[in-house]
Amino acid sequence: MLRIPVRKALVGLSKSSKGCVRTTATAASNLIEVFVDGQSVMVEPGTTVLQACEKVGMQIPRFCYHERLSVAGNCRMCLVEIEKAPKVVAACAMPVMKGWNILTNSEKTKKAREGVMEFLLANHPLDCPICDQGGECDLQDQSMMFGSDRSRFLEGKRAVEDKNIGPLVKTIMTRCIQCTRCIRFASEIAGVDDLGTTGRGNDMQVGTYIEKMFMSELSGNIIDICPVGALTSKPYAFTARPWETRKTESIDVMDAVGSNIVVSTRTGEVMRILPRMHEDINEEWISDKTRFAYDGLKRQRLTEPMVRNEKGLLTHTTWEDALSRVAGMLQSFQGNDVAAIAGGLVDAEALIALKDLLNRVDSDTLCTEEVFPTAGAGTDLRSNYLLNTTIAGVEEADVVLLVGTNPRFEAPLFNARIRKSWLHNDLKVALIGSPVDLTYRYDHLGDSPKILQDIASGSHPFSQVLQEAKKPMVILGSSALQRNDGAAILAAVSNIAQKIRTSSGVTGDWKVMNILHRIASQVAALDLGYKPGVEAIQKNPPKMLFLLGADGGCITRQDLPKDCFIVYQGHHGDVGAPIADVILPGAAYTEKSATYVNTEGRAQQTKVAVTPPGLAREDWKIIRALSEIAGMTLPYDTLDQVRNRLEEVSPNLVRYDDVEGANYFQQASELSKLVNQQLLADPLVPPQLTIKDFYMTDSISRASQTMAKCVKAVTEGAHAVEEPSIC
């Protein structure tokens, strides 16, 4: 069953979306021949005229058509002539027929496009000099290429009242050409039916009908797909032109998905963040936190080293003084008297440098803020803590069981993949945990973790659904593993996954077991041998503690001896810095070339877009300098040498943009039998239940005024956020 209209689903197929609809193997053998301006091309039945033209490299103008959305056919800019046909046809919506000769540059085609463009420009305001879309506007480009050189319109232009849909998207609806891309994105990709049209003909308007915030974690993507300047970025308004900015390809670290992004900078400042195409991860979308939290990069920053004086106050100092103090304390302790905690935004290079430094003083107490059970297989088997099916792999699944997670806010782009498969492939989804709005229908099996034992034993009705599935996925949220019975939950999920693999029709290379992480540094830290959670530090408090970007509040001053010497190294004055005796300012992800590993085990690199503010430096360089002053010099001086060291410890960390398949599920299941199987009666409640919990989850987003406005708008309404009254 298709959950979108059949005609729209078939006509809207493109290279990027064909894989998500199951087709018969005979389709490829039934190719038909058509001609584009006399040039022969072989295409599959159902291919549209527009797709056939693109196959031979002929670009057809369009406004409403988008490769990842259903076909609307309402802008008519893609009109082309078919030889011997009485009228021009809309190329985006018309399937080709055998023997057709498509004329893309005939006089009839040119006249039709010119007429459509004239109608579109009739009511369009001459805002180009003050429009934020200027320089990357489809209407500008296509009016130059396909429009007339003069206007015949003398009547008054219509004006439309702007809509307030929140603090992120700025609307100037007089510029709207009713292409409905934003409406289709909202309903099909984001799964939120907040946008629609009212009125008809000249009175048609796009909006929310009643004034309200556009309640979606993916709302910023409508800015990218809007072909005109009707929808632009509020935080970016009137700040820069696209040709003034320098573009740097990088990745996002706001969650564990690792979305590919482009960082636009000017004069050493991040001006905006845009999505970058990566079919296996984020396609061409990014979350609102990824897109709009960049203003947090210039607020609450640590720009100079600081030390705590005799009065207990933190004061500025030099790098030499700060590092000398830390080195002196480091030389005073040995073994587990020295410990470290790594936060959620730390890169792999800093993790290996800190590990090597503490190993020099015979300490192996290196912990992460996130807990992951070490009982049973624990972190010894890499497949035990990865999203093994991969992010794109969910499009092949036929059943998904979500356990203790809300992927909509923990991993928005992964949730969009699930919705895509649910929409096109008849994917069946079930959830164990608190009921949440996932933007697609699912079976709520309850919120008790004991349901896992019923499914494993076969006594639960959903057990049969899993047994009959050909490609099932069990996805366990990392938030569920923070509980006291996290080990038992992991063991139960591992047991279910292994039983499905061995007793149903699952193919040998299909991976059932999946862990969905929430933070960017966790997989790399586990790969490098960090201990998940701070239990070891709480049981045996150290005399010296390194907090490497640790702002999760997992440990407080009260948990440590009064004389414990705390060093905080990071880029924001958030939770960790105020309790430190020495603060070492580090670089944020836009200010360094660094390695991060996403939840599926894919290593990727951030790139230097701007220089760190003030005296801040890259984390691994700070640790390397500290080691030299302390007389225990680490054996690397360059970034390449650090990455060679990464390769020695864990080769996966330098196999960039590659996912290595792991298949140790049977061993993990056997080892899980050694775990205490006792489950608590407490319900599984993910920490991010609503969109209000999505916006401020790390030191960067908590420093962002834009994210604070989003929380206020969600809580009090879009009208509660005052915006400057300019254009």
UniProtKB/Swiss-Prot annotation:
Print the keywords alphabetically: 2Fe-2S, 4Fe-4S, Acetylation, Electron transport, Iron, Iron-sulfur, Membrane, Metal-binding, Mitochondrion, Mitochondrion inner membrane, NAD, Oxidoreductase, Respiratory chain, Transit peptide, Translocase, Transport, Ubiquinone
Q: Which CDD domains match?
A: fer2, MopB_Res-Cmplx1_Nad11
Residue ranges annotated for the 4Fe-4S Mo/W bis-MGD-type domain, each copy included? 245-301
Residues in 4Fe-4S His(Cys)3-ligated-type domain copies:
108-147
Q: Which cofactor does it need?
A: [2Fe-2S] cluster; [4Fe-4S] cluster
Major location, coarse class? Answer: mitochondrion
Q: Where in the cell is it found?
A: Mitochondrion inner membrane
Recorded GO CC terms: mitochondrial inner membrane; mitochondrial intermembrane space; mitochondrion; respiratory chain complex I
| Alphabetized GO MF terms | 2 iron, 2 sulfur cluster binding; 4 iron, 4 sulfur cluster binding; metal ion binding; NADH dehydrogenase (ubiquinone) activity
- Sequence positions that bind [4Fe-4S] cluster 1: H124, C128, C131, C137
Q: Which family does it belong to?
A: Belongs to the complex I 75 kDa subunit family.
Kindly give the PANTHER family that the UniProt entry links to this protein.
NADH-UBIQUINONE OXIDOREDUCTASE 75 KDA SUBUNIT, MITOCHONDRIAL (PTHR43105:SF13), RESPIRATORY NITRATE REDUCTASE (PTHR43105)
Subunit structure comment from the entry: Core subunit of respiratory chain NADH dehydrogenase (Complex I) which is composed of 45 different subunits. This is the largest subunit of complex I and it is a component of the iron-sulfur (IP) fragment of the enzyme. Complex I associates with ubiquinol-cytochrome reductase complex (Complex III) to form supercomplexes. Interacts with MDM2 and AKAP1.
Q: Which named protein is this?
A: NADH-ubiquinone oxidoreductase 75 kDa subunit, mitochondrial
Q: Source species, please?
A: Bos taurus (Bovine)
